Structures are given as C-alpha cells and as structure tokens.
Swiss-Prot record:
GO molecular function: guanyl-nucleotide exchange factor activity
InterPro entries tied to this protein: FUZ/MON1/HPS1_longin_1, FUZ/MON1/HPS1_longin_2, FUZ/MON1/HPS1_longin_3, HPS1
Quaternary structure annotation from Swiss-Prot or TrEMBL: Component of the biogenesis of lysosome-related organelles complex-3 (or BLOC-3), a heterodimer of HPS1 and HPS4. HPS1 cannot but BLOC-3 complex (heterodimer of HPS1 and HPS4) can interact with the GTP-bound form of RAB9A and RAB9B. HPS1 and BLOC-3 complex do not interact with the GDP-bound form of RAB9A and RAB9B.
Entry-linked PANTHER family: BLOC-3 COMPLEX MEMBER HPS1, HERMANSKY-PUDLAK SYNDROME PROTEIN 1
Compositionally biased spans, kind Polar residues: 269-288
Listed name of the protein: BLOC-3 complex member HPS1
Record-level GO BP terms: blood coagulation; cell morphogenesis; eye pigmentation; gene expression; inflammatory response; intracellular transport; intracellular zinc ion homeostasis; lipid homeostasis
Species: Mus musculus (Mouse)
Keyword flag Flavoprotein: no
Function statement: Component of the BLOC-3 complex, a complex that acts as a guanine exchange factor (GEF) for RAB32 and RAB38, promotes the exchange of GDP to GTP, converting them from an inactive GDP-bound form into an active GTP-bound form. The BLOC-3 complex plays an important role in the control of melanin production and melanosome biogenesis and promotes the membrane localization of RAB32 and RAB38.
Keywords linked to the UniProt accession: Albinism, Guanine-nucleotide releasing factor, Repeat
Tissues in which the protein is found: Expressed in all tissues examined with the possible exception of skeletal muscle. The highest expression was observed in lung, liver, kidney and spleen.
Region: Disordered, residue numbers: 246-350
Length: 704
C-alpha cells in the first residue's frame, strides 16, 4: 500500500508511482462511488481525483498563512501521508501498510528529487521547463519517462531494504588489495589513457572509470584534472547501474519468493528489476588519480587466494525499542521476479546516458555538471562504468554562475532591497553584469539579448530605475532563458537523443580487455561479494559482538560484516530466520540512530531483549586523534532527512564543526554495534572504542 506523487498546485500529476495493492485499493474505492457501467479513468486521473483536496488545501494554506502541514495520518491510522514542497511542486508519499515511517517517506521524496536533478541538471531550477521534461505532451514519451523513474524508485527501495550501504548511505568496497591494485592499473593504462589517446573519441574525455561487483566497488580510477566524486553521486551511479544491469538471483530463489505470500511486495511498476541477493559490506573506496598513485585500502585480517585459471566460459540511557520497526528481511518479496519481468531487460549493451554530477571546473565548484555514463557489463553482477565529459562542459560553469547570481539578486529584492544605487553598489551585482555582458556578446539569441537590455535599463539606470517588482519579473525571464540554453546544450544533445558519445568500438575494446583481465577472477569475485567481511576475525578480540557498521563520513565509505538473511545464501549467522532477525535489529538501529541524531544526540545506548545496541558519532583530526565533542544542530521533523542522497547532512555537519577547528582538517565517523545483552555497558563502550581504533588504523593503510 504505497504511493509517491509529484503534482502542481492545481493537482496536475507530473509523476506517480504506486504498488499493486494501492492501485487496486484506489480502483475499488472509485468503483463504489462511480456508476458500474462507466469506465474508470486511468490511474493518473484517479490519483489526481484522490489527492486534489490535499494538494490544493496544502498550497492554499502556504499562500495564505506562509505555513502548511507536512505530515498527517488518516482515520484509524490507516494511511500515513508525508508532503514536501520542492520549488513550485508538491511531492507526496503515502504508506498504508505501516512498513514505512515518516522519516522513510520523507527520505524517499528527497531521493526522488535528487534523481530528478541527476537526470535533468539545472533545468530543475525552472518550474515550467522541468514540468515539460516530467510530463511531455507525447503520451508514449511520458510513459517512458515515468516508467524510468518508477523503476529507479523501486530499485532504490529494494537496495535500501537489502544493502547495508544503501541503509546507511555510504559506499562499500570489495576488499582484496591485490586484485584492487591490478584492476586500477588496468583502468588507468588500458581504459582511461587508451580511450583519451584515441583520435576517434570525438572530443569526449574519460574522467572516471570504476568496477562494480554487485553493489560493491572493486576499483576506481580518476584521470588528469578530474574532480573527486561525492559519495552521493557515487551511490547514485551504483543505483543507476543496478537499474540498467540488475544482479540476478538464483532461479530456485525466484520461484520460492514468487510462491510466498509475503504482504510486502515490490511494486509492479518496476517489473524489470530481477532478484538480488543480500550482499556484504566493505570499507574505504580505493581511488587513484594520475597525479597520486597511492590507493587507500583497509587491510583486514582476512585470507586471500589466487584462483586457478577458469576452465572456460562455463566457468543515552535505556530506551524502549519502538513498535512497528523494520520487518524481517525474509518478508520482503519481489513481485516482479517473474519470467516476464526478467525478460523485460534486454541483454544488449545499455546505451550511454546523460547524467549531472557535482564537479570542479577550472578550480571553481559547479553543481550538476553534465557527464555521460557508460555501463559496460562484463558478466552478470560485474560491471565497468565510464564517466566522460564533452568539450561544452565549461558552458555549464558559466550558466551556473549566472543562474546563481540572478537567484541571489532575486533573494535580495524579495528581502526588500530597493533598486537603484544601493543595488548597484552590491559587489556581486557588478560581477554579474560583467559576466552576463561577456556571455551575451558570444550568444546569437535575440530574445535573451533583448531581455538583458531590458534588465540593464531598469537595474542600472540612474534617472529612472525600475521597481523591485519589475526587476523580479525580468530576473525570472532571464533565469528561464538561461535554463533553456542549458537544456538545449546538454539535454537535447544527450547521447540517448542522438548526441555525441564514444564510438562503439572503443567501448567494445575496453570491455573486452577488462573481461580478459578479470576472467580468472570472475567466480571468486561473485563469491567474495557475498562474503566480503566476516565476523570470525573479530570474535576473539570482541566477545559478545554480533554485528557492527563503521562509516567514515568524510569520505562516505563504510565497512560491515556480511548479512545474508536469505534461505539460499548461508552466512555466519546461518540461514533464514536468525540472520533475518539480526538484520531487522540492525536496520531498526540505523533508523533510531538517525532519529536521535536529528535531535542532537551523538551517542545512543540501550538494551532490547537479548541485545544491547549502541551508536556513536565523533570527530578526529588527520592524525587519528579524537577531537572534543560539541553540540550538533537540532533539526525539525520536516527537515531534509539525515544522509547523503536526499541532502548532504554530513558535509554540512563537518563544515559546522570545522568553524571551531579552523586550523586543522576534521574527519567525522560513525559506529553502530549490536552486542549480546550479557555484555556490561562499560565493556561495550570499551569494545566500541577499540573496534573504532582498529578499523580507523586499517583505513589509513595504503596499498604498496
């Protein structure tokens, strides 16, 4: 019983996503109120009819009172509604089976908004343009766009419920230093440098290349001048890869799950996402640029082996555990794991995709820079990803700076800044005028030239300056025209619409070479990804420890032992119910820790039945010395959720803490642990400190 909707203030649907149960419930409700002989409207219109009163009342309250409701429950607590306004449009999430909390629903809405930004870039700044992208006039094109985001939302929901990396929103790495180093060298010499040296690349330049095994990062390489990818962007890329090339489950498991009667089903709006097995977690992301060849790694006490050649292609206080927590993982079921669902994914090579990620251009930060992503499948579950930039990338920086300048000007005018000499004296206004004059000089569009002349006559006239209201109107027109240029430059020319991209033979060559290099490791990698980090090596030093998740929030990387609540996938906790029970405890601990961190609590200790749960957040300097703790900001219930996909909370937290430590770099860490309840609290805290120190020291070890 789940639904997500994006609508205008007039209740026009721009996007929707429902599961089968919600759609059926809505159909039955409308059948009772409509004449049985009349044909029911399409689902889009049904949702508009259902939610129009909510949407219109919410927007009216906002207009009249400058405030509105953001969450409510229906009678008898049957349905939970969460509303979040982004720009001009209202995002609504509904849950009717009590499987998601207010925080879960709000996080889902923020992730959806982030996915819109990744796909449309700065076009999302303009309400009219993003409306045309999300709701094209052509019905077939609209269905294609909606299906794409429905599938992405379904994939995200699945990964969030199954993958520890998506639960805590941090990148996990497959830990094998030897293979990691070999793979990085191959990416550097035979992929990135080889493609960039080819005269046939058509102006495209490979910036980043990385290897994924399921959701784990095996190796990552960045070329000359490439910016560091944010953890949120890397997680988004992993999500896109899992959507394009979903990791297959076993046929037996799919049959068993199809026959189950689990109440929680994945919505059929994303039917082409096959089953994925639970996967284990890892540690720091290995990266190496052409400027710096050292690769970060974690050296954990594990045994590694080189596989024999493949025989061939066949080869703070006591708290009460909240009711209604995360259900056991074995209750999760994929409704689309059917032959029809599996067949809907074509085995052909995915086409290049235009995406927008944060980057630095000419040493200037620029959000939502256009890139082209190439997902090159090596084997089921193993993929190579390339990210390229085009020669027109510098235009993105210019457009962002102009849009940012006009947005700041709008803010000043709305705050009561009068037009005239006071406005002209603002330093950013002179800089904006200079950049815009230079930009207009190199553009041939008559419309934007005329609008700019109109703006200058109103903003910089000493005799008859325009009013603030007039300047706001012209500012809005200029921003829209800049967004139109952005759209024509980067969306209309996207590879999926016939725009420039790497020649197919260069992609094929890189794909073939990487397959040859990894052929002898293929089976090992697939097994290793399921059992990446084990608890065995920790039990002797940390008796009573059941599970942990360690996160370096500065780099957005994490390490955790594997959790496999799957009947077919054995783990140290055995099969089925026990592993599922522990997983449910861990997921509930993650949610509870976020809730208390939102209220300013950085330490959490409590007992629930046979387990003691703990959560710690702390800061260190680059030498690994713990820094004095401060009070972290308290956030409202309707604020952007804690995490990195929906909003970069930890980057803001680091910036906030660094104000009190301006002379040294600051790092942020989190540790979540699950112990047996026989372990005393003081010993638990001691173990947590020792575990954090051990993992922290390992994370600073580099490969030879």
């Amino acid at each position: 019983m789940k639904c997500v909707l994006v609508a205008t203030e007039g209740a026009e649907v721009l996007f929707y996503w429902t599961d089968e149960e919600f759609a059926e419930s809505l159909r039955l409700k409308l059948q009772q109120s409509e004449d049985e002989e009349e044909e029911l409207p399409v689902l889009e219109d049904q949702l508009s009819t259902l939610l129009a009163p909510v949407i219109i009342s919410s927007m009216t309250m906002l207009e009249k009172l400058s405030d509105t409701y953001t969450c409510f429950s229906t009678e008898n607590d049957n349905h939970l509604y969460v509303l979040h306004l982004f720009g001009e449009y209202l995002f609504v999430a509904i849950n009717g089976d009590h499987s998601e909390s207010e925080g879960d629903l709000r996080r889902k809405l923020c992730v959806l908004k982030y996915l819109f930004e990744v796909h449309f870039g700065l076009v999302t700044v303009d309400g009219q343009l993003i409306r045309k992208e999300l709701r094209p006039p052509d019905l077939e094109e609209r269905a294609r766009v909606w299906k794409h985001f429905q599938r992405l939302l379904g994939t995200y929901s699945y990964l969030r419920d199954r993958e520890q990396s998506f639960a805590v929103e941090a990148v996990e790495r497959l830990i094998h230093p030897q293979l990691c180093e070999q793979s990085i060298e191959t990416l550097e010499r035979h992929v990135v440098q080889a493609i960039n040296a080819s005269p046939e690349r058509g102006g495209e330049e490979v910036l980043h290349a990385f290897l994924l095994v399921h959701c784990k990062l095996l190796a990552f390489y960045s070329g000359h001048g490439a910016s560091t990818l944010r953890p949120a962007d890397l997680l988004a890329l992993i999500l896109l890869v899992q959507d394009l090339q979903p990791s297959p489950g076993t046929t037996e498991e799919e049959e068993e799950e199809e026959d189950s009667d689990s109440p929680q089903r994945r919505p059929k709006s994303s039917q082409n996402i096959p089953v994925q097995q639970a996967r284990s977690q890892s540690t720091s992301v290995p990266t190496r640029s052409s400027r710096e060849t050292d690769t970060d790694s974690i050296s954990l006490p594990e045994e590694y082996f080189t596989p024999a050649p493949s025989p061939g292609d066949q080869s703070s206080g006591s708290l009460v555990w909240l009711d209604g927590g995360t259900p056991p993982s074995d209750a999760l079921q994929m409704a689309e794991d059917t032959p029809e669902g599996l067949a809907s994914h074509s085995p052909e090579l995915p086409s290049p995709r235009r995406i927008f990620l944060d980057a630095n251009i000419k040493e200037n930060y620029c959000p939502l820079v256009p890139h082209t992503m190439y997902c090159l499948p090596l084997w089921p579950g193993i993929n190579m990803v390339l990210l390229t930039k085009s020669p027109s990338t510098p235009l993105a920086l210019i457009l962002y700076q102009l849009l940012d300048g006009f947005s700041l000007l709008e803010k000043k005018l709305k705050e009561g800044q009068e037009a005239g000499s006071a406005l002209r004296s603002q330093p950013f206004v002179a800089d904006l005028r200079q950049k815009m004059d230079k930009f207009i000089k190199n553009r041939v569009g008559q419309e934007i030239q005329n609008t700019w002349l109109e703006f200058k006559s109103k903003a910089f006239s000493r005799s008859e300056p325009g009013s603030s209201w007039e300047l706001l109107q012209v500012c809005g027109k200029l921003k829209r025209q800049l967004c139109v240029i952005y759209r024509l430059s980067f969306l209309v020319t996207a590879p999926s619409r016939g725009g420039p991209h790497l020649p197919q033979h260069l992609q094929d060559r890189a794909q073939k070479l990487m397959k040859e290099r990894l052929l002898d490791w293929k089976d090992f990698l697939l097994v290793k990804s399921r059992r990446n980090v084990t608890m065995v090596s920790y039990l002797e030093d940390f008796p009573g420890l059941v599970h942990f998740i360690y996160v370096d929030r500065t780099t957005g990387q994490m390490v955790a032992p594997s959790l496999s609540p799957n009947e077919k996938m054995s783990s140290e906790l055995g099969k089925g119910p026990l592993a599922a029970f522990v997983k449910a405890k861990v997921w509930a601990l993650v949610r509870l820790a976020r809730r208390y961190l939102q209220k300013g609590c950085t330490t959490l200790l409590f007992q629930e039945g046979d387990f003691r749960c703990s959560y710690f957040l702390w800061f260190e300097n680059d030498m690994g010395y713990k820094l004095q703790m401060i009070e972290v900001p308290v956030l409202s219930d309707d604020s952007v959720p804690i995490g990195v996909l929906g909003g970069d909370y930890y980057r803001k937290l680091l910036r906030y803490y660094s104000k009190s430590h301006p002379s040294e770099p600051v790092r942020c860490y989190e540790l979540l642990t699950l112990h047996l309840s026989v372990i005393p609290t003081d010993l638990l805290v001691q173990q947590a400190s020792q575990l954090a120190r051990r993992l922290g020291e390992a994370s600073r070890v580099t490969l030879p």
